[in-house]
Amino acid sequence: MGRRQSVVCKFIQRRSLHDLRMEADRISRTAEFMAFFRALESTGPAERRVLTDPFAANLLRPNLAGAVRLAQVPGMRKIVERFADLRVPGARTSAIARTWLIDEAWIRAIKEGIEQFVLLGAGFDCRAYRLNESARAAIFEVDHPAMLSLKRSRLGMARVDVPKNVRYAGIDFNRQSVGDVLAANGFDRGKRSMFVWERVTNYLTDEAVDAVLRYVGDCEPGSRIALTYVHTGLLDGSASFFGGKRILRDVAMIDEPWTFGFDPAALVEYLRARSLRLEYDAGAREYRKDCFGGHSAKMKGYDFYHVAIACVQTGTQPQT
């Protein structure tokens, strides 16, 4: 290779790396806020916090990591929480409650002998590292290549050892098949599996959501999926939610507009047509009560953000 070609190749490599980092920065914002909320919750008194994530703070950029450190100063935690709650009403408590809820489903799946876990849109999720009971199962973290690269880089900088049972698989949900990506990374459809699809569906197309749920519905009976979704009434204006208009404006401003939602009243039939049986569906008000009990009475906002859990049915064929 000549000198000129070598210079050109190095330039292209640098540009590709730069573009990857820029893309990672763009798509990591909401994932980072989720990690921030978990890190903030982890600073609370052990007897009061509902979850502990010792890895989340390592994934934050300096300003958010600084806020977590500030929260550990006596008397400052409530102030940091209040500031976060004023900025996006309900986001923090909703995020913590649904993380707790899905954690519980994950732990139950381990006890039931589930052999594979798939994090669809893994982002800065740390279940593969903090829920140690899953060490015997295969775990697949599926997300945009730029997101996975950023996550691995930050974990590496923090000297976090990635468990040997964790595999990373890059995907563009709107353009690639989940089945193809998982198959290429050793996923076995003949084993019961637990899918977690958190904080993703609201960014996709109808076709992409349909394709993923049909794939899950065609997996081994007894497999489950825990997913989050936005009430379609927020998107089309047919329902009103506290703080709803503000959050739509905010996500549009950071170039992460919400594009998809479900009508909760139609979800049972939608899933049944894809060989899935709905086991749980609740908005933030309900799952915050499940998590925080009576303390949830004063928590407001994000009622449009649902968690649903569904199981692959036995002996059924998906409808076309």
Language-model regions: role of each:
Residues Q13-V118, F124-A169, R189:
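Rossmann-like AdoMet
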Residues R29, S238-T320:
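Rossmann-like AdoMet/SAM-dependent catalytic core
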Residues V196:
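A conserved beta-strand element that flanks and buttresses the S-adenosyl-L-methionine
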Residues Y203-Y215:
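A short, conserved alpha-helix within the catalytic core of class I
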Residues V178-R189:
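Short amphipathic alpha-helix with an adjacent loop that forms part of the alpha/beta core around
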Residues I171-S177:
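Conserved acidic residues
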Residues E220-T232:
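Conserved beta-strand signature within the Rossmann-like core of class I S-adenosyl-L-methionine
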